[in-house]
Amino acid sequence: MKDLFLFSSLLDASHTFSYFFHIGLVALIAVIVAMMATRSMQLVPRGMQNLAEAFLEGVLSMGRDTMGSEKGVRKYLPLVATLGIIVFFSNIIGILPGFHAPTASLNLTLSLAIIVFVYYHFEGIRAQGFIKYFAHFMGPIKLLAPLMFPIEIVSHLSRVVSLSFRLFGNIKGDDLFLMVILALVPYIAPLPAYVLLTFMAFLQAFIFMILTYVYLAGATVVEKGH
């Protein structure tokens, strides 16, 4: 991104400052949106409150399809919705000229993936107990436990890589795609690209949220007979 103008470079041209500047900007936008949505709550929602309630209801619906338990869905709503908001706004500001998407940095995507990884294991242990939770890693056949346990460990660790690199790779690719389009045809032609990249911002946030619910469901929802 050295050749692109960033507003953050007016204060400091370093990559570290740019990263934290845009992270702070995303946090500020999220706080402002939350304040606008809750400033004057009404029984019949309007404006930003209506959008916020529609978003939260969509996240709840996603959770119900994944977890089944209404109690669990609502319990994890704050985490999943917050992650979705952070990922979406981090994606979307990268589309705007003069700004850089924080999710185009592996620092943020890896941090978010580690938060999800640690939290769903913590919830799984709290719901089932330490021994019972890790006993599931050994599979139903005791003879194959020495083989299954390391495979399960690697499988869970790969989720960190999958969550972080999927988001990072897609948004980094979007940034490069937009940079090429703007360099070749900087005026009317990029408009369809902006529509596509906005859709991708929604899609990547959706994928991150639903995978978080899937991992939480796998850790906390225990089938009868297990």
UniProtKB/Swiss-Prot annotation:
Cellular component annotations (GO), alphabetically ordered: plasma membrane; proton-transporting ATP synthase complex
CDD domains assigned: ATP-synt_Fo_a_6 (cd00310)
Molecular function in Gene Ontology: proton-transporting ATP synthase activity, rotational mechanism
Keywords, ordered alphabetically: ATP synthesis, Cell inner membrane, Cell membrane, CF(0), Hydrogen ion transport, Ion transport, Membrane, Transmembrane, Transmembrane helix, Transport
Gene3D superfamilies: ATP synthase, F0 complex, subunit A (1.20.120.220)
Single biological process term from Gene Ontology: proton motive force-driven plasma membrane ATP synthesis
Source organism, top-level taxon: Bacteria
InterPro entries on file: ATP_syn_F0_a_bact/chloroplast (IPR045082), ATP_synth_F0_asu (IPR000568), ATP_synth_F0_asu_AS (IPR023011), F0_ATP_A_sf (IPR035908)
Transmembrane intervals: 17-37, 79-99, 105-125, 134-154, 176-196, 199-219
Membrane topology reported for the UniProt record: Multi-pass membrane protein
Compartments where located: Cell inner membrane
Family: Belongs to the ATPase A chain family.
Functional description taken from the UniProt entry: Key component of the proton channel; it plays a direct role in the translocation of protons across the membrane.
Protein name per UniProt: ATP synthase subunit a
Higher taxonomy: Bacteria, Pseudomonadati, Campylobacterota, Epsilonproteobacteria, Campylobacterales
